[in-house]
């Protein structure tokens, strides 16, 4: 597999690993999203002191209003974070 194919598979695996423990295997609940972020993106929540960060994130990601994050909504989040990191590293001259 190519590097990009491997990366895509890893994103799918991460979503699957955290979805389904509280509800459907096709979506992340608020609790599942929080655990995913704590384990996979610890710096994202750690830097903020806002206790409602996961609630706000869920509201922003939940395009269809079902109080859960499906894979399409999750991948938009991953793409946005990746884009922000890319811009940061370009500005820092680390690319």
Swiss-Prot record:
The protein's name: Protein S100-P
Binding, Ca(2+) 1: 25, 27, 32
Main location: nucleus
UniProt keyword Secreted, yes or no: no
Self-association state and partner proteins as the record states: Homodimer and heterodimer with S100A1. Interacts with S100PBP and S100Z. Interacts with CACYBP in a calcium-dependent manner. Dimeric form binds to and activates EZR/Ezrin by unmasking its F-actin binding sites. Interacts with PPP5C (via TPR repeats); the interaction is calcium-dependent and modulates PPP5C activity. (Microbial infection) Interacts with P.falciparum (strains 3D7 and FVO) MSP1 subunit p33; the interaction blocks S100P inflammatory and chemotactic activities.
Domain of life where this protein originates: Eukaryota
Localization per record: Nucleus; Cytoplasm; Cell projection, Microvillus membrane
Biological process (GO), any one: endothelial cell migration
Entry GO CC: cytoplasm; extracellular exosome; extracellular region; microvillus membrane; nucleoplasm; nucleus; secretory granule lumen
Mutagenesis or variant effect for residue 68 to K: In S100Ppa; permanently active, interacts with EZR and PPP5C in absence of calcium
Function, in words: May function as calcium sensor and contribute to cellular calcium signaling. In a calcium-dependent manner, functions by interacting with other proteins, such as EZR and PPP5C, and indirectly plays a role in physiological processes like the formation of microvilli in epithelial cells. May stimulate cell proliferation in an autocrine manner via activation of the receptor for activated glycation end products (RAGE).
Repeat in keyword set: yes
Tissue/organ expression: Detected in all of the tissues except brain, testis and small intestine, expression level is higher in placenta, heart, lung, skeletal muscle, spleen and leukocyte. Up-regulated in various pancreatic ductal adenocarcinomas and pancreatic intraepithelial neoplasias.
Molecular function per GO: cadherin binding; calcium ion binding; calcium-dependent protein binding; magnesium ion binding; protein homodimerization activity; transition metal ion binding
Effect of residue 73 to S: In S100Ppa; permanently active, interacts with EZR and PPP5C in absence of calcium
PROSITE patterns linked: EF_HAND_2, S100_CABP
Residue ranges occupied by any EF-hand domain in the UniProt entry: 12-47, 49-84
């Amino acid at each position: 597999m190519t590097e990009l194919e491997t990366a895509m598979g890893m994103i799918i695996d991460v979503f699957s690993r955290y979805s389904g423990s509280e509800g459907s295997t096709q979506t992340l609940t608020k609790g599942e999203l929080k655990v995913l972020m704590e384990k996979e993106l610890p710096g994202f929540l750690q830097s903020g002191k806002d206790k409602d960060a996961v609630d706000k994130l869920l509201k922003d990601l939940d395009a269809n209003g079902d109080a859960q994050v499906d894979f399409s909504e999750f991948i938009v989040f991953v793409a946005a974070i990746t884009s922000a990191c890319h811009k940061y590293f370009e500005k820092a001259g680390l690319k």
